Amino acid sequence: MAIGKRKESTEVKKKDGSMNKRVKVAKLPKKVDSFSPKKKKNTTSSGSSESDSMSQNDKKKDSSLNESEDEDFAGFGESASENDELESAESEAENDEESSSQKSNSKESHAQRKKLQKERKAMKPFADTSLKAKSLWDKLRQKTSIKAEERKTIIAELFDLIRTNVKQLVFKHDMSRVVQTCVKFGSKQQRETICAELAGSYVDLCKSPYGKYLAIKIFKYGTPKMKEVILGEMYGNVVKMIRHREAAYVVEDAFREFTNLQQQRALICEFYGPEFQVFKDRTQDIHIDKLLIDHPEKRPSIMQNLWKTIEGSIAKGSIGFTMVHRAMLEFINHADSNEAKELLNLTKELIYEFVHTRDGSQVAMKLFALANAKDRKVMLKSLRPYLIETAKDSYGHLVVVAALDCTDDTIMTGKLLQAEFEGELLKLSADKFARRILLYVLVGWEDARYFSKENRELLRSLDSLKAKTSKKDPIVRRNELKATIGPLLISLISKAAGDMIAESLASQVLVDALLYAPCEKEEAVDATLKAFDGNPEQDNHLIHQIHCSRALKTLVQNGHWSGAEKQVVKAEDDLKVASKLIVIIKKYLVEWASGDGAFVVVAVLEALSDSEKQEFLKILRKHKNQLNKSEFRGTKKLLEML
């Protein structure tokens, strides 16, 4: 074989077990130039002739050698490409062989690891119990596909498995849920048994990242006696638990959801000092007000310990806890000016964290009343991103009212309300709590129609606190706010009067905005009356809704009825609604006067001038026979006037 085509063959085993020839190409020598030895210099002629003859022979040999080399290297490019293909096939075969071996090795190692894991689990205590219990629990957690009787049977079987071993099992991450399910679906006797087995370990249970959920379940589904057992073990450890990462949530849930006032005070009293942590008997009602009256000498110690607990809880990130809010409220209720200032400095940038609870909102309101102008600005700035949510909260909206009622810088508060409320005014006016902020701006918090007696007393209690920090007259302050918010509400009414009057709560904002907003309101009044246009006999007419007829009657009277004064208290601006409404009523006079709109017609008659009234009465008398057929009280009142 020629040099360029010399090959060696070996055999390669395929994945399927068959043999495949692998071709190995030998290395080729470098191509050399034709051989031509150096000529020697000869002085004789014979030497030259000999050399000439030799050179001719050499040329012939060289030419023949070149021809043979050309023949040998013919097709060398083709064999090189074949070699490349064969080498790539060889590498692919090797890679496939390696990957298949790696896969088989990984499967084997995975199986070995799984086997070892099972063996290790089997060696653990209660391994069989845990396995059986989890199998039963898996059936129980399928809420839709299991019947009550079947659940009861499985619970009984599960309870027999874990009984006497609850304390050991409940601290395990997988078995904690199993025991929780037994407490949730078990009988009273089964719950009492589990509770009794855990006696003496409830503090550790609350500190466990898995066990804490069982403690909460016992609070939720247990009897009052079971709750007393857990609380009894908590007594003396409350301060430590409230600062513990896991136990703090159990104490908070117990305090907020599952305890009465006396039990709450029994938990809180541990914040007053170590001497209150010693006594396990908490049957007596311990309250800080009574303590400070009976033992005034203990005030410095109690206030210092309360402050340490508050400061430590905030440092731990527990400022959102209801229990901490109660401690803060008790602290600020009995704090002197320096102590109150310390609490203000600690919490003024975290005000949004505690406005959502009853106690926390009262703390925030008192802090706003005690703060100076600079601190109020910081507090409002921290509250601004959450202003909408706070306004809609059952307690938070009172904080916003208190902040507006204390802050003299009405330019700042007006811009704040305009920026945050303007795009949400329609929704806010229909919200149960947020609308009260708008109504405060329009009529003040003294109005009993919108603010309960408790809330009015709470806001009134701030007057003495803000006397030193707020200089403006409350009426002046509110009128300045009204000048900013009033036009926004009137603009909204002009665009969406129908939507507002149709909504019971929003209609209150609409009426008071039309009565008391200090701006041009004619367009808004026309838009409101237009919503009542049409035949009152239609079922969807607004007059059939009680709040709509009441709102329209108030606008016709140009003010609200005062029970104390026994008369309508007129607004300063006369809207002249009665004169405008006649145009709408005349189209369907009998329907208005003999149906749900009868009292509105009576109010129109009372509001008109004498000349307008006489003219309207003439028109009504023409339909007296039709009106006599009506049984509506308003129609009978109207007939008396006729």
UniProtKB/Swiss-Prot annotation:
Signal peptide extent: none
Record Pfam families: CPL (PF08144)
Location of region: Disordered: 1-124
Comp. bias intervals (Basic and acidic residues): 1-19
Disulfide topology: none
Gene3D superfamilies: Leucine-rich Repeat Variant
InterPro entries found in the cross-reference section: ARM-like, ARM-type_fold, CPL_dom, PUM-HD, PUM3, Pumilio_RNA-bd_rpt
Entry keyword annotation includes Ion transport: no
A Gene Ontology term for the protein's cellular component: nucleus
UniProtKB keywords: Nucleus, Phosphoprotein, Repeat, Repressor, RNA-binding, Translation regulation
Positions of Pumilio repeats: 160-196, 197-232, 233-269, 345-381, 382-418, 420-460
Biased amino acid composition, Basic residues: 112-123
Compositionally biased region (Acidic residues): 81-99
Biased composition (Low complexity): 43-55
PROSITE patterns registered for this protein in UniProt: PUM, PUM_HD
Modified residues annotated as Phosphoserine in this record: S34, S36, S79, S81, S88
One MF term in the entry's GO annotations: mRNA binding
Annotated compartments: Nucleus, Nucleolus
Stretches assigned to the PUM-HD domain: 139-489
Single GO BP term: regulation of translation
General function of this protein: RNA-binding protein involved in post-transcriptional regulation.
Homology family: Belongs to the PUF6 family.
UniProt name for this protein: Pumilio homology domain family member 6
Originating organism: Schizosaccharomyces pombe (strain 972 / ATCC 24843)
Gene that produces this protein: puf6
